[in-house]
Structure formats: C-alpha cells, structure tokens
Curated annotation (Swiss-Prot):
Pathway: Amino-acid biosynthesis; L-histidine biosynthesis; L-histidine from 5-phospho-alpha-D-ribose 1-diphosphate: step 7/9
PTM-bearing positions, type N6-(pyridoxal phosphate)lysine: K213
A GO molecular function held by the record: pyridoxal phosphate binding
The protein's name in its UniProt record: Histidinol-phosphate aminotransferase 1
A Pfam family it matches: Aminotran_1_2
InterPro entries listed in its UniProt record: Aminotrans_II_pyridoxalP_BS, Aminotransferase_I/II_large, HisP_aminotrans, HistidinolP_aminotransfase, PyrdxlP-dep_Trfase, PyrdxlP-dep_Trfase_major, PyrdxlP-dep_Trfase_small
Gene name as annotated: hisC1
Entry EC number(s): 2.6.1.9
Cofactors required: pyridoxal 5'-phosphate
Subunit structure: Homodimer.
PROSITE patterns: AA_TRANSFER_CLASS_2
Source organism (scientific name): Bordetella bronchiseptica (strain ATCC BAA-588 / NCTC 13252 / RB50) (Alcaligenes bronchisepticus)
Catalytic activity: L-histidinol phosphate + 2-oxoglutarate = 3-(imidazol-4-yl)-2-oxopropyl phosphate + L-glutamate
Presence of the UniProt keyword Repeat in the record: no
C-alpha cells in the first residue's frame, strides 16, 4: 500500500498465474502448456528474424501476421486483431467493448482473469452459475429486461474443459443482438467447434484465440481476435491509445510460420487429444470422476481423496497439477495433458499414493 497509488489500485485482486517453478526434473502439468515444441518452421523463422532488423520497430499493424491468421481461419485480414497474448487482447476487449455501465455476464466457474479486468476497469459484472454437471446452459444467457453490458465465456470452458456446440453458442449470440458476445477459444483446437465461421453472420460476435496452446508458442505471447470490422476498429483504437507496437519482430515471424504449418499443427493436436483420452480412462480406472474434456487438460476429482492433499503429495514426487481453492471446485484437480510418458508417470505416482 502506498499513498501514491491511484484509488482503484488498492481495490484490485490481481490474477494469480499458474506456478512456473525453476526446479529441475519436474513433470509440469499445471499450466496447460503444449508438451510438444513449436513447429520447426516457426523456430527457423524466429532465427531468421533475429538479425540487424531488430534495431527497427516492428510493423504496428502486423499486416503479415494478420494475413496469415486470416488465411488459416477463413476471414479477411481486416477482421483480425492481434495482441501480446490473448490476455492483452481480452484486456482491450473489456476496455473497448464492455464499459457501458451495465453488468458483464460470465460463468461463475471460468477464467479467473475476467473479474480482474472488471475490477481494473471498474466494470460491474454478474456471474452465471454453471449447471450441476458443470455445463454452460445457453438458456441462462437469455436476456431479461435491460441488455447485458457484455457476455464472455471460454469454449471449451476453463477450468472444466466442457464445450458447447457451435449451434449452442449461436443461440446465445442470436438471443443478445444488442450485446457483444465474446467467445474465448484458447483451447478450441483440442476437440471443440470454433465459431469463427459465424463472425460474418453476427456483428455482435467476437472470437478470441491464442497461439500459446495448440501452436506451442506460450513463450512468444501472441493472441488474436476475429470479428466484424467495427469491433476490430474499436480494439485498434484502444490498442493505439496504449501501445502501438505490441507484436515484436520475432513473435510476428514465429507466429506467421506456426499459423502456416498446418501439418505440424494437426499432428501435434491429434497427439494431445489421443493422450487425453488414454489419461482420462486411466484416471477413471483409479476411481476419479473425470469431466468430459475438449481441451488439453482434464478436470477430475476423487471421492475418497482430498484434492489439495493429492496435489501436495504429487508435488513431493515432482509432479505439478493445478488446484483451485474456489467454491464448487475445491475438490477438483486440473491436469494438463503431457506426453504419454509424463501422463504414465502421473498415473504411476497416483497408484503409489493410493496404496501407501
């Protein structure tokens, strides 16, 4: 606390990121990083960009990167907004599109950065409970009276991993024509349906994605939004009032190459999905309740073992998983899908814990 702080600073409850320990030989299954490295073509592009041109500012419009993203997802380049990770994109979304004085709506169990943004920008919000089986119910997002100041939810949801079908998302968008609906698709490439094809049909729909998960570039920090030209223009106005150069030359080069290497993208995400199904079956065989997942993680609880204690005992064995001290989910563990060997080590450690 400092007397020099702006008044809002003392009211903030900042986001707590997943642990990034520096200890050697850890099996790190706590922050949903891809177990496979970036596309070799992305690494080559980064190396090629690391030359004399680094003395020059990058393209403030990121035209080449936006073009590569547009080609990969099937929209026009002027329907793409890029930022320094999807977290920065989301921060601009809250500033540009959600400050209407009316509550923004999002699930009670969801990405915990959403209420942080609301606190930072002094935006009122309303949480919408998930169903008893941890699903987002489109019927809960039907407007009642005054339009919401915005609607945002991950699909697949995080940390649950459950996904809505494209037609279910469209029901929410169609039912709220006077409200911007933001679909946070950080994990969509691991088995869910993207609603990117709907942005031409609905001018109130914005889709946010990242290269951190399925493109294995969490260390570069590149995210993007897809939407109508009017929504994208609003985001550009906020960005250029904050930082005109969010994407550096190395990140732009690597991200472009990653978006263009479809074969590597498909091969690695299919490998993650196959491992997820094997790990889910192994966890169920050990007595875990495992929610259906369309993400690169699973959300599981054991009826006879406390989740926090399990996380601690796994850590003693150099295996990190994520535990949330939050109502309704404090007995769940979120477990990132690692390599087959990492997931086998997890199952082996759990067997030893249960038998001890």
């Amino acid at each position: 606390m400092s007397r020099h702080w702006s008044p809002v600073v003392g009211t903030l409850s900042p986001y707590v990121p997943g642990e990034q320990p520096k200890l050697p030989d850890l099996i790190k299954l706590n922050t949903n990083e891809n177990p496979y490295g970036p596309s070799p073509k992305a690494l080559q592009a980064i190396a090629a960009a690391a030359g004399d041109t680094l003395r020059l500012y990058p393209d403030p419009a990121s035209d080449d990167l936006r073009g590569a993203i547009a080609a990969a997802v099937g929209v026009q380049a002027d329907q793409v907004f890029v930022g320094n990770g999807s977290d920065e994109v989301l921060a601009h979304v809250f500033m540009a599109l959600f400050r209407h004085g009316r509550p923004v709506r999002f699930p009670d169990i969801s990405y915990s950065f959403y209420p942080v943004y609301c606190g930072l920008y002094e935006i009122p919000y309303q949480v919408v409970p998930l169903t008893d089986d941890f699903r987002i119910d489109p019927a809960d997002y039907q407007p009642g009276g005054q339009a919401a100041g915005g609607i945002i939810f991950p699909n697949p949801n995080a940390p649950t991993g459950r996904a809505l079908a494209r037609d279910e998302v469209e029901r929410i968008v169609t039912a709220n024509p006077d409200t911007v609906v933001v679909v946070d698709e950080a994990y969509v490439d691991f088995g869910a349906e993207s609603v990117a094809p709907l942005v031409d049909r609905h001018d109130n729909l914005l889709v946010v994605q990242t290269l951190s998960k399925s493109r294995s570039l969490a260390g570069l920090r590149v995210g993007f939004a897809l939407g109508s030209r009017a929504l994208i223009d609003g985001l550009e106005r906020v960005k250029n009032s904050f930082n005109s150069y969010p994407i550096d030359r190395l990140a732009s080069a690597g991200a472009q190459a990653a978006m263009q290497d479809q074969a590597y993208f498909d091969r690695t995400r299919q490998a993650v999905m196959a491992t997820r199904e094997r790990m889910s079956a192994d966890l169920r065989a050990l007595g875990f309740d495992v929610l259906p997942s369309a993400a690169n993680f699973v959300f599981a609880r054991h009826p006879e073992h406390d989740a926090a204690q399990l996380a601690a005992r796994l850590r003693e064995r150099s295996i990190l998983v994520r535990h949330f001290r939050q109502a309704r989910i404090d007995q769940f563990l979120r477990i990132t899908v690692g390599t087959d060997a990492q997931c086998e080590a997890l199952i082996g450690a759990l067997k030893k814990i249960f038998s001890s």
